[in-house]
Amino acid sequence: MFKTYRKLFFCVIMANVCGLASFAQQAPPAATTNYNPAEAFAPLFYTQNGNEFRSASGAPGSKYWQNRVDYNITANLDDVKHTVSGTITITYKNNSPDKLPYLWLQLDQNTFKETSRGYAITPPRSRYGAQGEKFDGGYKIENISVSQKTAAVKFSSMVEDTRMQIRLEQPMAANGDVITIKMDYSYIVPVSGSDRTSHLTTKNGEVYAIAQWFPRMSVYDDILGWNTLPYWGGGEFYCEFGDINFAITTPANHIVVGSGELLNPQEVFTGEQLKRWNAAKLSDATVHIRTEAEVTDPKSRPAKDKLTWKFKITNARDAAWSSSKAFVLDAARINLPSGKKSLAVSAHPVESNGTDAYGRGVEYVKASIEHYSKTWFEYPYPMAVNVATSISGMEYPGIIFCGWKDKKENVWGVIDHEFGHTWFPMIVGSNERKFGWMDEGFNTFINVLSSEEFNNGEYKPRPTAWHNVGRSLGNPALENMMLMPDGMAERNIGYNLYSKPGWGLELLRNQIVGKERFDYAFKEYIKNWAYKHPTPIDFFRSMDNGTGEDLSWFWRGWFMNSWKVDQSITEVKPFMKEARLAGYTIKVNNLEKMPMPIILQIKLKSGKTETIKVPVDVWMKNTSWLVRYNTTEEIKEVILDPEKLIPDGNAQNNRWVSDGNNAVSAPNIDGLLGTYSSAAIPIKITLSKVDGALTAQVPGQPMLTLTFDSGNKYIFEEGGIEVEFTADKTGFTLSQGGGSYVFTKDK
């Protein structure tokens, strides 16, 4: 509206001056800005429509499908040679609408071969790889067979790096065909395998953390078909869901913990341990199944040579386990919202025991699982096992591996983080190898809420330093969070996969859409994609639809790019009504590419302080915005983002303070009223008083309201117009667009 008035009013003036109507539209010099509303709020963020597989609302479509795989594994642990050997039967069901002439399997242990791609690209001192260990790494696979309905199937196989291809003579049929693959395999457990699997020497024996321990099916989906990115260590996993039965044979003096339910506790515990195990299922307090004092007591284990521990986990994408004769073992009941129960378990060497370490492990596991279950989605597994070992922190369904030397808040932090991964990616099965931020970032976000609640804030995290975050944005050395984990510098993984996406969700929840709407949409996303495979676009659509907001501007600026945020206060000016101070206009500029809501704290002369919030929508078509604040009292100070809740990378322009000369006296405009003419322009301007305000009008044109600026000056801000009266109020000089014109009051 204001721009229309400016054009109509000054086309008349300037056309008479120079005959050039376009000259009338010159604007005052604008603050230098990198912000482009058309870029930030550009439409067509989604380049494809929803379909019957993945709906436009972000939920799975009516014909969404995914394949299924079940595993049956028997394995042996040799604690002298540090080897795992076993036999696996894979039952694979093709629910896709496609025929499958070949199948792809993941052979993650092959990354530790000296001939592997992972070995070749892993730099010295990396967290990944085998930490320089020289050993005969990788799988040794024998006796592969393929069958359908007990009949043998002709096939050939090929191993390429960390992948195996099974080439079928006859393709698997679409929509439900089932095939069975069986093989024997073995491998040497690395001392440190990409900080995800390992064996640790303690004073009472070796602690084995066994993961990536069996050939797994790759995912075939409606996005890429076969997902065959090799395993190099940085990118984690993308796995199909199904049931996993596994039996682990170890020396009898070992205790084994694993994913899912322990099916035969009566066969592997002593009588006293079984009694304690069952008691723990009914206890909210920690029950010591095997105490620190009992670890070195031979009577604390059955007097046998070998024992087989049997586990089953259902509707899971993976399984892991740990074995040691050095374990202290604790447990307690987990209470779930539905009334169901699970079991919190902590297995750790005596070096990690104590109330300042994993002696509180069960307490931490229980609290973490109960919090996430009531807040987001119920925990699905019968046990939740923490193992203290040489791995700094790694998650698997129903079991996690944590750093054995951690203490106090670090123990809570690693347990809570790794069990938070139950929801991302164990339940919501995103593709970690391509989009690591979809599990690490989401998990980092929910960890903050969990830690705030635990034990009345015992380990409450420090608030996010948003202005520090803002200074990091746009730094090209930090790369982009949408890169694949294996495609970014290792030093940037923490920032891009964990911190920045976590901050993004925190911003959305606290500053942009609000907690109630965010939480509802986020829970709907989890519920809709539980045990399925969402993409980033599915997530973005889910949040848009669930919150009722088009958040394309946010996904574009924060996730797809790393745009900077910089808002500034340009000026604070009073306005009058009925010849009295009626309020102020506060001009805020958006100087960088990322828009954000405006948060202003206004302090009045009396000491009264008020905070107002302006939605991000004001930036849809503006690079600056006038915030109108009604008050009859003088403003002493204005601060942008006073509590530092927005990632503004430049706080130097966020504060305006009165210089003491800004006291507003109500000018008497009665002496200014009348009709004015200019010798240079054959036009008349009539100044009138309307609702106490000074207005200007050219015959036949809309009326403009002039705002008092200072001294004898009035302005029309949007048009860049200044009207400065003579001291005797018999005339004024009108300035706009670099031109000045003298008007004199008619007699």
Enumerate the language-model features and the residues they cover.
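A surface-exposed beta-strand-loop module
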Residues: A27-Y35, T83, K93, K99, ...
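Beta/coil-rich, acidic/histidine-enriched accessory regions frequently appended to metallopeptidases
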Residues: V80, N528-P667, I685
